[in-house]
Swiss-Prot record:
The gene is rnhB. It catalyses: Endonucleolytic cleavage to 5'-phosphomonoester. This is Ribonuclease HII. It is found in: Cytoplasm. It comes from Streptococcus agalactiae serotype V (strain ATCC BAA-611 / 2603 V/R). The lineage of its organism: Bacteria, Bacillati, Bacillota, Bacilli, Lactobacillales. Keywords: Cytoplasm, Endonuclease, Hydrolase, Manganese, Metal-binding, Nuclease. One of its GO terms (biological process) is DNA replication, removal of RNA primer. PANTHER family: RIBONUCLEASE H2 SUBUNIT A (PTHR10954), RIBONUCLEASE HII (PTHR10954:SF18).
């Protein structure tokens, strides 16, 4: 009779819930075997659910693949709402039908997984571009226009020319064909990839600023108006990276 350890190893090779080998092991009365069967089936179902989710997030890309358009850049930004720091945009071109496990809107992914998924994107992407507009630009032309500038810069920094742009809720002044997608980071893998790249990039920038301007907890709040950040403003005043066109900073000038 096979040991529980040996059976567990065999179960790991089964990837189909309809595999006939399940019947052989389900008659084994040992609790350890039954527990292993339940866990393996749970893992397989989880993988199937993830595959279906990723497939659904390729709907916009697949419409373009049918038209023989394969170099598709997903574009997203992070940092429109904070009181301090830049707005950061990313443009990412993934290979056709590329499915990176657990890739999703950055807001739906636990922060502890951001770096791993970010690295997977960098490893698999055909091209990645970053665009950054600082607080001075935001104050000069407003956050909406600064966001568009950052997105255009991100596209210009791609090492591969995109044939089509998938953009999260924006239309850019570019001649490249584009599709505006509401909640794009939750509905397109290309945009979700850009969301993660922009998020990790901006978080690193704000973490570095925490060393330059201590007392505002930038590494924790990324420039958003948390209690700790607002207390820092009252105690230490405005820094060069604060957005002077945003309240409450505007009223502090």
């Amino acid at each position: 009779m096979a040991t529980i350890k040996e059976i567990k190893a065999i179960l790991e090779t089964i990837v189909d819930l309809k595999d006939k080998r399940w019947q052989e092991y389900q008659t084994d009365s040992r609790a350890g075997v039954q527990k292993a069967i339940l866990q393996r089936k749970k893992n397989i179902q989880s993988d199937l659910d993830e595959e279906a989710r990723l497939e659904q997030m390729l709907v916009y890309e697949k419409k373009l693949y049918i038209e023989h358009i394969n170099l598709i850049a997903g574009i997203d930004e992070v940092g429109r709402g904070p009181l301090a720091g830049p707005v950061v945009a990313a443009a990412v071109i993934l290979p056709p039908n590329c499915k990176i496990k657990h890739l999703n809107d950055s807001k739906k992914i636990p922060k502890k997984k951001h770096q791993e998924i970010y690295q997977n994107i960098l490893d698999q992407a055909l091209a990645v571009g970053i665009g950054i507009q600082d607080s001075q630009c935001i104050d000069d032309i407003n956050i909406y226009e600064a966001t568009k500038h950052a997105m255009i810069d991100a596209v210009s920094h791609l090492s591969v020319a995109p044939e089509h742009l998938l953009i999260d809720a924006m239309v850019l002044d570019l001649s490249i064909p584009q599709t505006k997608i509401i909640k794009g980071d939750a509905n397109s893998l290309s945009i979700a990839a850009a969301s993660i790249v922009a998020k990790v990039t901006r978080d690193k920038i704000m973490s570095d600023y925490d060393s330059t301007y201590p007392g505002y907890a930038f590494s924790k709040n990324a420039g958003y108006g948390t209690k700790e950040h607002l207390e820092g403003l009252q105690k230490y005043g405005i820094t060069p990276i604060h957005r002077k066109s945003f309240e409450p900073i505007k009223s502090m000038l």
